[in-house]
Amino acid sequence: MRFPTPLIEGRLVRRYKRFLADVTLADGTMVTAHCANPGAMLGLNAEGFRVLLSPSTNPSRKLGYSWELVEAELPGGLQWVGINTARPNALVAEAFRENKLTPLIGYETLRPEVAYGKASRVDFLTSGGGLAPCHVEVKNCHLMRQAGLAEFPDCKAARSARHMEELAGVVTAGGRAMLIVVIQMRAGAFDVARDIDPVFDRALRMALEVGVEAYAYTCAVGPEGVAIDTPVPILTPGATLQPARTSG
């Protein structure tokens, strides 16, 4: 996914009220950008970090910029990280259209935001191709506390735990369901940050036990764009250690 307009570079001053970030642009101008990220953003929101913003083309929008990327000093080195949690669903849809997601090859249709379970909406429902429909839940990941190991979540994630329970219900009823973790940075493996949210950890393990599938993909991240790139193993007990290969 290429950014439609060139990103604008700045330096982070502060991130506050979860969804706001003050940034100093290269010319010294201070702007407030929308931060589409409800998480703690551990290790990603230090003052002085180099950031990239996307300018809005909507003249009626209150904030003229959205925070897209941060160049963070993570364990293992400096790298660009995508922090916009609105991007992963679009990245999955793009990879689906390009037949890059091996577990979903053969399906013809990817419908977003389909109601299911008790009171949830699944990110995607795949259908067609003579295959059983598959409920797909997408999670964004940008936490790294050990070199090469991506983790989720970076804060309590009660809603995500409920999603795992709903996916488990789909499989228990005879359907197919999967979790796709989109890691908006380079990493060699994925695991649950169980010390941060043991409830989500238990919910995912229970889902895996009944047959919910789980896959994790890193992304190629840079000023020009973000794209799903490489599958990596999931270290959570009950998940397969063999990553699902991208195709194409």
UniProtKB/Swiss-Prot annotation:
One MF term in the entry's GO annotations: DNA binding
Domain of life: Bacteria
Pfam families listed in its UniProt record: SfsA, SfsA_N
Transmembrane segments: none
Annotated family: Belongs to the SfsA family.
HAMAP family: SfsA
UniProt name for this protein: Sugar fermentation stimulation protein homolog
Organism of provenance: Methylorubrum extorquens (strain PA1) (Methylobacterium extorquens)
Taxonomic lineage of the native organism: Bacteria, Pseudomonadati, Pseudomonadota, Alphaproteobacteria, Hyphomicrobiales
